Amino acid sequence: MSSNHQSRSNEGPTVHGHPCSCCSMSRRSFLGAAAACTAALTTGCASLQSLHTRPRSNEEIDIASFRPRPQVRVMSVIARQKPPYWLGWPGTAYPLESERARYTQAIADAGRRIGVEIVQEGEPLEDKEAVAAFVKKVQSEKPDAVLVMLQHFQSWGTAGEIAKAGVPTIVFAPVGTAFTGHVNGLAFRSGVHVISSLEIPAIEQALRMVRAKRQLEATKLLVVSGNERKEGKFGLVSLQYVPRATFEEMFSVTPVSEEAKWVAHQRFSEARKVVEPTKEDGLNAARSYIAAKQLLKNEGCNALTTDCLGMVSQKKVPTPPCMGASIFQDYGVTYGCEAAVGPAASLMLTSYLFDRPGFMNDPVPETAKNVLIASHCVSGTRIYGLDRQKEHAPYILRSHSESNLGVSTQVLWPVGQPVTLVQFFKPDALYLDTGTVAGNVNTPPAGGCRTSVEIRMDDIEDCRDVLGFHQVVFLGNHRRDVEAFCQMYGINVVHSPRAHGETAKPA
């Protein structure tokens, strides 16, 4: 351990005072960045990422290239009665053709935004013969999903027939085409998702479900642990195990390159403050990030989880991978802790289904306040979304608390905002709960990991009854969206019990 690390104290957060090229910014650089930011905002550019990038050398690996982008194909069709209408909802006054055109365009636009190909059927289904022919077409072409839009409340039978084709089915019923009785029979069927709404974002989220499932299927998770090389599966995700020494060796041959200097500079310069980490820590953390990218490329994988504590406890590497893992999460590429496969799959779920990073954590009960503290040393900063225009959460650079080595992000989560907790505890089953951010805990005075978020749980009377370990927390109340995904793809959902002694609640 270096003298820098040995001299660290347990005093409260203060910015270190030594000059450090990896975490300082000159006045000229600051003014240039500010001008670029103003230009970006006034011209409405698609991404603010350019503020922090530089020309990449041929040797550098684009982190975003690991995020799977499989082809996703959805067949879309209108189901209705033969017009003109006389009585019956949506009503004779309803502008049938203009609404058909508007929603058709909205569905196409939603698909384009998230990378889903929409194949629109040319004519609406208005009789039994057309329905039967379309069902045969679906069974023959086997798209990833079918989206059925209803334009009459007597067309629910058509939706049911299409759902029997054996392909995941999204039913969109604009308000005015369904009563509760229409929806109830189909809405809770496995493999089906029913939207009764005027909200276009609900259609886009349904298409994200289809895309997320394909992304999980396309993901190969690198598990860096143990001494053997083998393959496996966890639900939809393929697994590639490699010996832990593979990463240790990769780190040892990764130099302090220009990329490493830039990565350290960027992460340090955007921090609210820097407490324990030194310049050397920043460069080693950047080397770990680059080594992880190279290992992923060498193994042909899309995500990884490493035996990070084993490497650090045995002093095989001089830094935990926390800073690099946080950067991975910010680019939509999963980097899980402790070679834990289920939590890594949970991180993928939030990233693929909602385009925002999750926070894998240890659950700590705070019994005086009756809140759960979600605590770990890796959190992404783009918790509002992977879109680079969205502001990242403020963060403080700290050491990894258990070892007092390296660089970890203490991300400050927004108090008062809702959050969702998910964890695959089996390949086909997950825990699902929600809550609200109540505060951020500093270390010290607390012990434990650097990002520690207080969560006041919904529908759980006692924080000690929250189920799971290494749950993944992400911003927003997405309970219904997660339940919809699980219903579509046959995943069992379990909620923590409301009161102590009650059994866990299935969704």
Regions found by a protein language model. Give the residues of each.
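Bacterial signal peptide processing site
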Residues: 46-47
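Extended hydrophobic packing segments that form well-structured cores
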Residues: 404-507
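Conserved, well-structured core segments that form the ligand-binding/active-site neighborhood
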Residues: 34, 40, 178-354
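N-terminal secretory signal peptides
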Residues: 1-25
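C-terminal catalytic subdomain
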Residues: 332-437
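Metallocofactor- and cofactor-centric catalytic cores in central/energy metabolism, strongly enriched
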Residues: 50-156, 160-176, 210-211, 240-259, ...
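N-terminal export leaders
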Residues: 25-43
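Gly/Ser/Thr-rich loops at beta-strand to alpha-helix junctions
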Residues: 80-82, 125-129, 148-158, 173-181, ...
